[in-house]
Structure formats: C-alpha cells, structure tokens
C-alpha cells in the first residue's frame, strides 16, 4: 500500500480495495478512478454529494466525469427508468423512444440532421472517423496532442485523461500501421494545421477536435480558432468532427457548436445525454449520415444501440436542460473558479484558472495553458496536495490535473460557499 496519508476514516474502503485487487485490475474498472493510496468506495449519492462506505460525505465536482448534470439520483430519471424496466430492457427492435430522443437532439444541435445511437463516446468517435474515411476514401486523420477521444486504436496517441495521468499517453498494443494514419497537431496553433494539410494534400479524411479540451484539464479554444478549422476544412474537402462527448448539452443547449457559433459536419455526443446510463451518438448532416448501413455501405452496429433504458434516461435529462439550467450552472462555476484564482493569488501560488460555462479547472502553472505541451508541465505534485486537501475537507474532484471539474443544477449558493471555505483551508495548508 502507498504511504500517502489521508486524514479521514477510510477503513472500509481500504478493505474493499484490498479485496477488489484480487478480482479487478488495480481494483478499478477505469484508470481515472484510481488514486494513491486507494480510492474511496461509494455507498450512495444524492444531488450534489457522494457518501462513501465509511460515511464520509463529499461535495462532488467530478459528477461521474460529467454526466450527472441534474445531480445524483434524480427522481424524474429514476422514476422514468423504473417504469421502463417493467416493460423490458432490450428488444433488438426499434422503439418510439429512439425517435423522441433523436428529435430532441436535432432540435438542439446545429449540425444534427440525423442521429445514430451507440453505447459510449468511444464507439461514437470510432464510428464517426470510420464514416469520414469511408466517405472521403482517405485514410489520414488529424487529432490534437492531449485530446482524448476514447480508448480505441485510431486515437489513443498522445492522449489526455487517464492515459496521461498514469504516464501512458501512447498505449502499447496498437500497431504502427494503425497510428501511422493519425497526424498529431498542437491545439490552438493555426500554422501547424496549415502546414499539415499542405504536406498531406488530398489525403486527410477528417479533423477531430474537442472544442474545449476537457480531457487535459480545461483548455478553451483561442478566439476564432474553431472558425479557422471550419474554414480550412471546407476549403480542402476535409470533414470536421467536433467531439462533444463532454461539451455536448453541457455548455449550451446545442453544445460548443452553439456556444462558439461554429457548425461542424459531424459531432459525437454522450455522457450527459444518458442521464447516468451508457450512451453515445454520432450526429451530423443527412448527406453524410446516410452513408451508414443499412442505407449506405459504411458498417456500424451494436446490440444495445438505442436501448430503451438509455433512451428513457436521455429524454428525461434533456427535457430539464433549459435556459435556467445553463445560467445557473455557469454562474456557480464562475463564482467558484474566480474564488479559486483569487485565493491562489492571495497565497502566492503560481496558477492559471480556466472556465467555460459549467466546466472549470486550475493548473498549477505560471504559463498560459493553451495546449497539451504546456498543460503537462504543470505542477502535478501540487495538484495532488490540492486534491487530497479538498478530499479531507469534504470536497471531491477528479484525482488528476488533467481532468475537468463540473457544476450541476444542485450546486446551489450554499454548496458553493461551503466549497469556498474548504478551498481557503486547503490553500492555507499548502503554503504553510
């Protein structure tokens, strides 16, 4: 066991972790859930908080890495899902709920004329890239350093999220023949994109981009950068894919497309849309989407695609994401992130804080964080002191400098104020 000391009673979590390692790799089912000396095990959650098996209560800004926008154990979602459970969980046949949710997505998201449901963000990005390659008959794709588009071979190169946190941004087991078609570019760098396209004329199928890089912290696009990507892809007949698995339905009703006023050809969504259940989707222009089988020849399929449980939860979630939701969650994130920056400044701690609507993160870094190379030079040891300090004070964030924090509709002013008190205590302790 690691010698990191957390000043909380975590005896039951410790025992469960010891047992879990006998059956689960490092005791977890996703790398981002592990932290030293061991993660706490959750017993229950409600609204804005988690409760672990030892009875410790945490204000939650991880929110299951984004999906829990309406708070944990939302009664409307739970009741709707319970009712659907009485009628079946999977049919292998279409349901009306697939149409209902698709129509809601199309109503909200500017690029969405048609939808294909899948089961995760990973499936969505993999299928979107396959679609772009099939349509253009080109193999090469451009992705950005530090961007995480899921755990599939096309894009698991210089990835952010858990891959970067645990020191493996390039995963073994992926053939060079696969990744040789993946061209890396620094985010927010126009010249690099111009040069790559010039050197690979008529060979690039698509550019895939997180409009806000939420898997290497929270890095917003520079002014007009997304507009630049839209223009240069149109000029060169390259398909532009927005990976909106994080930003979709979170930062605006229509995601980053609406927020920044830039419409891609295709987009991928997930997380929030499932209301806590597994889900993903590829959305885009009809002329592109109709190339998926069975209408076209580009194959995409899944036993649980459009399953009625996820459709039910998705419908209930999106109907509650109104103007009040966006103004409230953005306001609470701004209040908290402003305080984080002011408090770090007061204690002479080098930092940069970035906020986009209800997404935010602090980097312990003196330099403006505009891309992966700068982000990975942040003081990760200091970040973990910040993480452990918050945990000891009843606040949970993702245990990585390279993840994002989120607010939900349940993070009221009182909750934010309590969090601010905890942050003040943590920064005092860090600088002692």
Swiss-Prot record:
Its main location: cytoplasm. SUPFAM superfamilies: PLP-dependent transferases. This is Glutamate-1-semialdehyde 2,1-aminomutase. Its cofactor is pyridoxal 5'-phosphate. Pathway: Porphyrin-containing compound metabolism; protoporphyrin-IX biosynthesis; 5-aminolevulinate from L-glutamyl-tRNA(Glu): step 2/2. It is found in: Cytoplasm. One of its GO terms (cellular component) is cytoplasm. Belongs to the class-III pyridoxal-phosphate-dependent aminotransferase family. HemL subfamily. Disulfide bonds: none annotated. Keywords: Cytoplasm, Isomerase, Porphyrin biosynthesis, Pyridoxal phosphate. NCBIfam families: hemL, PRK00062.1. It comes from Methanococcus aeolicus (strain ATCC BAA-1280 / DSM 17508 / OCM 812 / Nankai-3). One of its GO terms (biological process) is protoporphyrinogen IX biosynthetic process. It catalyses: (S)-4-amino-5-oxopentanoate = 5-aminolevulinate. GO terms for molecular function: glutamate-1-semialdehyde 2,1-aminomutase activity; pyridoxal phosphate binding; transaminase activity. The modification N6-(pyridoxal phosphate)lysine is found at residue 271. PANTHER family: GLUTAMATE-1-SEMIALDEHYDE 2,1-AMINOMUTASE (PTHR43713), GLUTAMATE-1-SEMIALDEHYDE 2,1-AMINOMUTASE 1, CHLOROPLASTIC-RELATED (PTHR43713:SF3).
């Amino acid at each position: 066991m690691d010698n990191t000391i957390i000043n909380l009673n975590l005896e039951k979590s410790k025992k469960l972790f010891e047992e879990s390692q006998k059956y689960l790799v490092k005791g977890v089912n996703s790398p981002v859930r592990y932290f030293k000396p061991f993660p706490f095990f959750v017993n229950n959650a409600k609204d804005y908080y988690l409760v672990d098996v030892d009875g410790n209560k945490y204000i939650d800004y991880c929110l299951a890495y984004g999906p829990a926008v309406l708070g944990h154990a939302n009664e409307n979602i739970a009741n709707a899902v319970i009712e659907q459970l009485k009628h079946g969980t999977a049919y292998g046949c279409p349901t009306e709920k697939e149409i209902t949710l698709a129509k809601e997505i199309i109503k909200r998201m500017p690029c969405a004329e048609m939808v294909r449901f899948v089961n995760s963000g990973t499936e969505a990005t993999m299928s979107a890239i396959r679609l772009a390659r099939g349509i253009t008959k080109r193999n090469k794709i451009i992705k950005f350093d530090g961007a995480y588009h899921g755990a599939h071979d096309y894009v698991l190169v210089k990835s952010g999220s858990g891959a970067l946190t645990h020191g493996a941004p390039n995963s073994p087991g992926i053939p060079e023949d696969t990744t040789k078609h993946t061209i890396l570019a620094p985010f927010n760098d126009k010249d690099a994109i111009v040069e790559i396209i010039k050197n690979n004329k008529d060979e690039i199928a698509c550019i895939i981009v997180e409009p806000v890089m939420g898997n290497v912290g929270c890095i917003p696009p520079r002014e007009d950068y997304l507009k630049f990507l839209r223009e240069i892809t149109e000029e060169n007949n390259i398909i532009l894919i927005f990976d909106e698995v994080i930003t979709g339905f979170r930062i605006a009703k229509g995601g980053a497309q609406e927020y920044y006023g830039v419409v891609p050809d295709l987009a991928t969504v997930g997380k929030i849309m499932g209301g806590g259940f597994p889900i993903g989707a590829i959305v885009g222009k009809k002329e592109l989407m109709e190339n998926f089988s069975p209408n076209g020849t580009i194959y995409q399929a899944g036993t649980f695609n459009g399953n009625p449980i996820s459709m039910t939860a998705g419908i209930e979630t999106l109907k509650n994401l109104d103007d009040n939701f966006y103004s409230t969650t953005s306001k609470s994130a701004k209040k908290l992130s402003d305080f984080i920056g002011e408090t770090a400044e007061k204690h002479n701690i080098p930092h940069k804080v970035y906020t986009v609507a209800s997404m935010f993160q602090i980097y312990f870094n003196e330099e403006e964080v505009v891309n992966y190379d700068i982000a990975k030079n942040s003081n990760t040891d200091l970040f973990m002191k910040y993480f452990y300090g918050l945990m000891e004070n009843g606040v949970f964030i993702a245990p990585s400098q390279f993840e994002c924090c989120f607010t939900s509709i349940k993070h009221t002013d009182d909750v934010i104020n309590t969090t601010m008190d905890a942050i003040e205590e943590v920064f005092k302790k860090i600088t002692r």
